[in-house]
């Protein structure tokens, strides 16, 4: 197992997939203050994510390095993924959820296609039992799974269902996939009363290359599990960001 082999001594000027989950705060700040710089920053981050972190085949880098000073785009790297050119499954799921949330704020129609492409990549790389491995380099074998990536992606698909017209073919795909993945998580990853557990779902992988939180419970896994359930049983559930 290895981390990135690229230079890591720049100390700054990186972006990463995880930051998509902070975008809503910038849009909210723009709405509350009336200061367009927050909205502009959010839109710029979305554009940068699309241009630099999403590859041509709709897979994703975890991080992307820019040249300090000039901010010239340099190369994609990883920290929690298997290798620089692989796709870390939870990082990719941040895109499955983050892009439709951004769409609800800025109404940019190109985000629908972007979201569809990254979501289909996620779905097309799931193993038969629908619980993703920690990195999409793996589709079988004994490598750890990451149930948190599954429930985050479910949240993203159900978010997109809210704004897609009934005529959009991906709407049915999202509904069906979300139901099947959520059922798989309940069957294979959730704990029952009386079991000795530290959370609601197991088989979360925090950072495999660093040996952190392997096949464990995690607060973010539990949170998005509950959110996924709420979204599924109550389609009118409203986000609070």
Q: Where is each model-derived feature located?
A:
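Glycan-recognition and catalytic cores of secretory/periplasmic carbohydrate-active enzymes
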Residues: 1-241
């Amino acid at each position: 197992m290895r981390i990135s082999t690229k230079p890591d001594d720049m100390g700054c000027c990186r972006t990463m997939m995880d930051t998509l989950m902070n975008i809503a705060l910038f849009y909210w700040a723009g709405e509350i203050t009336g200061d367009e710089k927050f909205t502009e920053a959010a839109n710029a981050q979305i554009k940068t994510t699309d241009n630099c972190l999403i590859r041509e085949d709709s897979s994703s880098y975890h991080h992307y390095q820019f040249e300090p000073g000039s901010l010239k785009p340099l190369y994609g790297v990883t920290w929690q993924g298997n290798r620089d050119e692989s796709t870390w499954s939870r990082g990719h799921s941040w895109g499955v959820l983050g892009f439709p949330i951004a769409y609800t704020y800025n109404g940019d129609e190109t985000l629908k296609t972007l979201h569809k492409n990254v979501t289909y990549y996620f779905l097309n790389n799931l193993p038969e039992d629908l619980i993703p491995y920690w990195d999409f380099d793996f589709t079988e074998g004994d490598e750890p799974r990451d149930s948190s990536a599954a429930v985050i992606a479910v949240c993203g698909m159900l978010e997109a269902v809210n704004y897609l017209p009934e005529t959009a073919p991906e709407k049915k795909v999202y509904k069906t996939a979300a139901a099947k993945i959520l059922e798989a998580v309940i069957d294979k990853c959730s704990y029952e009363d009386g079991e000795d557990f530290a959370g609601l779902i197991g088989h979360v992988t925090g950072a495999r290359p660093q040996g952190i939180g392997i096949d464990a419970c995690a607060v973010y896994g539990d949170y998005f599990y509950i959110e996924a359930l709420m979204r599924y049983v109550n389609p009118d559930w409203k986000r609070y960001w």
